[in-house]
Structure formats: structure tokens, C-alpha cells
Design a protein with these regions (language model features):
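Glycine-aromatic-enriched surface loops/turns that form tight recognition elements
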Residues: 1-89, 93-231, 235-309
Length: 309
């Protein structure tokens, strides 16, 4: 496959086969044979297959609708059998965030693989827990999840396949008995409690809140449970813990207790919205919102992670 950064995509033709030339540039009048036209993209990391938008027709980037009508395109596309598939659906927030490229903005996705995409909001399948009038979108200008009124009109980008990280059941997480938790889906190990907190239910102590630079250093300096390679998670990694079926916090609290209601956590990811870059991403776990905050002016908690190898 091809892709920027750590992304790995394969372009697919209308029948689902891999097109012969993978590094071609999209053209509306192009052909699959010369690699200038494709209908879907397979993410070789997640296994998900994504619909490609077109300037006109059923899959046009101009087609928008309310959340209540979000499944209309999926019904049409399944009848069409796009890319040989008939299980197209609206993606979850977790799934749609997997194609966000936090290394860029406007748009925050891999443009050569996803032509005709817009720096706009796209619906997900998830309602906002605790806010009955709203549903989750992903804003592809900034690459963040947002809560929007269900009556708003936004695009849908369809997905096909299953993604294990969308499940938050106990089988996914293994308590290692030393204050760490292993995620068998992502291959990451997390500290069970935020920095500064300890105990079976993470109720002892007080949460550490620092500016971004201090948080990065605190993570690097940690030797918790005998490991010396702790770090702040990047945006992608932190988002894998957000369970939007819950709120306040949007977490599986049977795995990650949060009795002190610590909600705001730094990530290591920089927000490319200013030059020079002065902001970084954080996750607000009240409902799972992604936000930008000035690195030197905002103090947030740290939730440490390492590669579980």
C-alpha cells in the first residue's frame, strides 16, 4: 500500500480488486487501468474499507443530510454493491478518527488517497451520550471530534468492515496486577491511574496537572512498574480509550477507575493550526471531545502509555 506518515492504504476499483497502479493521481475522467480513478480505499492497518467521494452522482461530496437520514447513502450503496461489498454503513467516531492525519490540517486526511474530500464535518453513527439532541461528527478541517445538532446537514463517508478497537468490553483489556493495563487490540500498555493517583480505585493522592512540556518530561522520567519507556500518548492512541456510549467520564471505568473525575489529558500531538505551532491536542473525557490548548498556558493531567512488547 501507500500513504503518508504511518498510514498504509490500498486503492480499490469498483469491483473491489486492487487497481494496478497505486501511486497515480486522481482524475474524474481517469481509468482504473492507469491508476487515475478508484472507488474505495482499504486501510491496511485497521482492515476497514472506505468510500471515495466524487464530484457528482451518488457519492458526491456535495451530498449532505441530517443525522436522522444518515443511513440513506448506505442503503443506496449496498444496493449498488460498491467495490463488491454490501455491508456499507456509517462509521463510528472511533472508526472515522482512524483516517484523521493529525500532522496536517485543512484537510486533516491523506489527500492523495482520499480525493474530493472536504475540510468539513462528517457524521458518525454515534449519538452524544447525555445530549439527546446531538450526535458525533468528525471535523476534517482540524481533525477532531465534535458534538453537533442532529438536525444539522453534514456529509457521510461510508465504511465497510469491523474494527476491534470500537469495542470496549473486558476481554479487550488485561489488568496486569501491577497498576498497568494491557490493550490486546492496540498492543499498548497504560498506567491504570492518571499521574499522581494510585490505589485500587485510583482514589489516593491528587492528579498531577502540568503544562505540556512538563507533562512530556514527567512521562519520560517515569519508571513506574519497572518500565523506563513511558510517554504521553499521541492523539490516535488516546482516542482509542474514548467510549462515547458513556459520559462523565467517557471511559470504561471498570478498567480505568476515575473517582476524582479527572477529565482533561494532554496528548503528545501538536495542533498544526498556527505557525509557529503553539498548541497541542488534549482529550476531554467528560464526553470524549478533542480540543486544542496552548501548551504553555494550560495545565492538564497525564495518562501514561508505553508499547507493550
Amino acid at each position: 500500500g501507500t500513504g503518508v506518515a504511518a498510514f498504509d492504504y490500498t486503492k480499490l476499483g469498483s469491483d473491489g480488486s486492487e487497481i494496478p497502479v497505486q501511486n497515480g493521481t486522481w482524475s474524474e475522467s481517469g481509468t482504473e487501468a492507469d491508476g487515475t480513478h478508484w472507488s474505495c480505499v482499504r486501510d491496511n492497518v485497521t482492515g476497514l474499507v472506505w468510500e471515495i467521494k466524487t464530484p457528482t452522482g451518488t457519492h458526491s461530496f456535495n451530498n449532505k443530510g441530517s443525522w436522522q437520514n444518515r443511513n440513506t447513502l448506505a442503503d443506496t450503496t449496498n444496493a449498488e454493491g460498491l467495490c463488491g461489498l454490501t455491508n456499507w454503513r456509517v462509521p463510528s467516531l472511533t472508526e472515522l478518527l482512524t483516517i484523521v492525519n493529525n500532522g496536517r490540517q485543512n484537510p486533516a486526511f491523506d489527500v492523495p488517497r482520499f480525493p474530493n474530500g472536504k475540510s468539513q464535518s462528517y457524521w458518525t453513527s454515534n449519538p452524544v451520550s447525555g445530549v439527546g439532541t446531538n450526535a458525533w461528527t468528525v471535523n476534517f478541517f482540524a481533525g477532531i471530534g465534535n458534538s453537533k445538532a442532529k438536525t444539522s446537514n453534514f456529509q457521510v463517508r461510508l465504511v465497510s468492515g469491523d474494527y476491534a478497537a470500537s469495542q470496549f468490553d473486558a476481554a479487550r483489556f488485561v489488568d496486569n496486577g501491577d497498576g498497568t493495563v494491557s490493550d490486546v487490540v492496540t498492543g499498548l500498555m497504560w498506567k491504570r491511574c492518571p499521574e499522581g493517583l494510585s490505589g485500587e480505585d485510583c482514589s489516593n493522592g491528587s492528579a498531577s496537572t502540568l503544562v505540556w512540556g512538563g507533562s512530556m518530561k514527567a512521562a519520560r522520567d517515569s519508571t513506574y512498574a519497572g518500565y523506563d519507556d513511558w510517554r504521553l500518548p499521541n492523539m490516535k492512541e488516546m482516542q482509542t480509550l474514548v467510549d462515547v456510549t458513556k459520559n462523565n467520564p467517557a471511559l470504561n471505568t471498570s478498567v480505568f477507575p476515575n473517582p476524582n473525575n479527572v477529565l482533561n489529558y494532554w496528548t503528545s500531538s501538536l495542533a498544526k493550526k498556527t505557525s509557529p505551532v503553539t498548541q497541542s491536542y488534549r482529550i476531554n473525557f467528560q464526553r470524549g471531545l478533542s480540543e486544542f490548548k496552548v501548551r504553555t498556558g494550560s495545565q492538564n493531567a497525564q495518562w501514561l502509555v508505553r508499547d507493550d512488547i
